[in-house]
Amino acid sequence: MIMSKDIATTPELSEPDKYFVEQRDLLLQEITSTLDSILNNLNGLNISLENSIAVGKEFESVSELWKVFYDGLANGAAPGVAAANPSSQDLPTEPVAAHQNAAAGNSDAPAPSQ
């Protein structure tokens, strides 16, 4: 708290001057308390921002994993997945309908070649 000279001990000040000094001291006290409040609120904001940044950093690895997954889908396959998928050479060349008709017992359908 900033205080000027004690008004009661200074007899040379006139009444308007005393009033001015009192009002100035009140304003300085109000400004000081407001600045303290602003500083405390800024510290709270800083802590909140640091916490949100920390949470964001915790999700970086998850974000990177999803990025690799998405890039793999965009490129057709993720690295190392192409070997696990059957190629078109491994697929049977007969139509699927022929197998379904034979299983249903339709005699009109050609028998599957083996």
From Swiss-Prot:
GO CC aspect terms: cytoplasm; DASH complex; mitotic spindle; mitotic spindle pole body; spindle microtubule
GO aspect biological process, one term: protein transport along microtubule to mitotic spindle pole body
Keyword Cell wall biogenesis/degradation part of the UniProt annotation: no
Pfam families membership: DASH_Dad1
The keyword Protein transport appears for this protein: no
Residue ranges, annotated region (Disordered): 80-114
GO molecular function: microtubule plus-end binding
Role, per record: Component of the DASH complex that connects microtubules with kinetochores and couples microtubule depolymerisation to chromosome movement; it is involved in retrieving kinetochores to the spindle poles before their re-orientation on the spindle in early mitosis and allows microtubule depolymerization to pull chromosomes apart and resist detachment during anaphase.
PANTHER family: DASH COMPLEX SUBUNIT DAD1 (PTHR28025:SF1)
Subunit-structure text: Component of the DASH complex consisting of ASK1, DAD1, DAD2, DAD3, DAD4, DAM1, DUO1, HSK3, SPC19 and SPC34, with a stoichiometry of one copy of each subunit per complex. Multiple DASH complexes oligomerize to form a ring that encircles spindle microtubules and organizes the rod-like NDC80 complexes of the outer kinetochore. DASH complex oligomerization strengthens microtubule attachments. On cytoplasmic microtubules, DASH complexes appear to form patches instead of rings.
Homology family: Belongs to the DASH complex DAD1 family.
Descriptive protein name: DASH complex subunit DAD1
Organism listed in the record: Eremothecium gossypii (strain ATCC 10895 / CBS 109.51 / FGSC 9923 / NRRL Y-1056)
Encoding gene per record: DAD1
